[in-house]
């Protein structure tokens, strides 16, 4: 086991323990997009199941969105060799996106909604206890700033949440993992990564701008990323302007 994998194991198991993400006997569905993050999470979590750290029933789900150039042959081989239960489901969400999104506009928002809808539907149909997503620490940091700057809200990606209809529980075991470690791990493991031909072709995305902003700030103060992350678990409601929060503090 490499130093990088040991580091990933440490932070993933810490998050699972700190936020009580897994229970014995859970039937879980890991969403494998074909990117480095979900591949890294799958490899580490599969190893933790193999060495009996967790007693859970793992199923891998991949959504083929019918994008031009999509080739999952190497992904299938990887999953077969790993010996995990999996399904690659084909849904033509790409066609919907191309039809609905005007030329020049970004696809990410609609693409994300359609993908999420299929994930939730599949999880309910197969009676999954939990849905596992591969978002990492940097995703949380960027999402917080994006919410503040572009939506006027203070929110990010929680380690665990229940969907509004109460039907699905979503967990993110990599909330403490840095993207740079996942990049290194992907190189070490040579994962058969499938690039996204949709978002990869759109350069002026808000997330990229926010990521660059954080990187620039970190050049002046390396603690900026960790400070932003720590702010998510160090909230002072009395110092905010939410009337409902302030009223609840007074009552």
Swiss-Prot record:
Substrates-to-products reaction catalysed: cytidine(32) in tRNA + S-sulfanyl-L-cysteinyl-[cysteine desulfurase] + AH2 + ATP = 2-thiocytidine(32) in tRNA + L-cysteinyl-[cysteine desulfurase] + A + AMP + diphosphate + H(+)
Cofactor: Mg(2+); [4Fe-4S] cluster
Motif, PP-loop motif: chain positions: 33-38
One Gene Ontology MF term: sulfurtransferase activity
GO process terms (BP): tRNA thio-modification
Binding sites annotated in the UniProt record for [4Fe-4S] cluster: 108, 111, 199
CDD domains cross-referenced by the UniProt entry: TtcA-like (cd24138)
Keywords from the UniProt entry: 4Fe-4S, ATP-binding, Cytoplasm, Iron, Iron-sulfur, Magnesium, Metal-binding, Nucleotide-binding, RNA-binding, Transferase, tRNA processing, tRNA-binding
Subcellular location: Cytoplasm
Top-level EC class as recorded in UniProt: transferase
Pathway assigned in UniProt: tRNA modification
Record-linked Pfam families: ATP_bind_3 (PF01171)
Family annotation (InterPro entries): Rossmann-like_a/b/a_fold, TilS/TtcA_N, tRNA_Cyd_32_2_STrfase, tRNA_thiolation_TtcA_Ctu1
Gene Ontology annotations for the cellular component aspect, listed alphabetically: cytoplasm
Gene3D superfamilies: HUPs
PANTHER family named in the record: AMINOTRAN_5 DOMAIN-CONTAINING PROTEIN (PTHR43686:SF1), SULFURTRANSFERASE-RELATED (PTHR43686)
HAMAP family xref list: TtcA
Function comment: Catalyzes the ATP-dependent 2-thiolation of cytidine in position 32 of tRNA, to form 2-thiocytidine (s(2)C32). The sulfur atoms are provided by the cysteine/cysteine desulfurase (IscS) system.
Family of the protein in this entry: Belongs to the TtcA family.
Protein's UniProt name: tRNA-cytidine(32) 2-sulfurtransferase 2
Taxonomic lineage of the native organism: Bacteria, Pseudomonadati, Pseudomonadota, Gammaproteobacteria, Thiotrichales
